[in-house]
Structures are given as structure tokens and as C-alpha cells.
């Protein structure tokens, strides 16, 4: 795909129509959940993602696939538990996916992605709030152009049959049901 690139970062115009892929060196797929009173952050280190930008923004499409075994919170025992049958069951379900079904512009550089999130073979519709951060030339003339997006959503993990928890004697539960998912990505054009 031959892509014209503005000479500087353009924060207002979407990149040209076509297929763009996640730059794995400049993309983070993270999640945040509460463990009692504190927030625990984690991420997936192995993933693929494509954004197909349409001639009209609402014709665009996003697909993301994460390798569930790549989950890490940088704490081995907790990571092993997240990979177990109590949570992601990575042996049975090696991937989780998001596929957009609709894009709704909500502002000049913001939009909602409606799509199907599949975890453990269970597919549920989610709404993802996203922001276009701009596009422009790569770091050097030899580098391809890049585009950047941020996205976030909140899910109830029990909707995907991740119900493990422990009641705390003083009230409440060990792990929150709600999980925030956040993506920061730079994209490169395909071709």
C-alpha cells in the first residue's frame, strides 16, 4: 500500500484508508483489576492486531488476538493462577479475540468500537472507548508512517466464566469482578 505521509504529525485527519497492523514494539495491551484494596496491573506480551481504515471512519474495522499464556503481572505465582482453570484456562483456550462490528464516531478524534470479545470460547458484546492520537512520518525517512490510537473498556470477568474468588472475613472479596482493559498502540501500514 503506497501511503502518503504528512510532513508532521496530524492529530485531526485519519490516516489513509487501508490495513494497518499493530507495531508490537510500541503497543501495550494491559488490564487492571483490584486485589482487595490495591490495583494489580498486567499485560499480554504476545498479540496481533489489525485496523482496517475505511474511506469513511464508520466503515473501519479492528481485530485483535492475544495469546492467553502470555499474560503477566510480573508475579510468577499470580501469573500461573491467571493461566489456570480458575481464570483463562490457557491449555484449552490459547487465544482471546476482539472483533469490531460497528464504529460510532463520538467526537472529532473519539469513537466507540462495538464488538465481540471472546474469552474461553464465550463471546460477549463490549463497547470500547477509543481515541485517535494522530498519524505522521516515522522516526526517519526509511521508516514507514505511523498512526496511534488509545482504547479502553471495562468488563465483568464473570461474564466469561472466570468466577473464582475468596470471601474476605472483614467483608468483600479478594479479587474484583470488574477488569479494565487498556490498549495503547502505534500502527504501521501493511505493504
Residue spans for each PLM region:
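Low-complexity, acidic/polar, glycine-enriched regions of mature
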Residues: 1-191
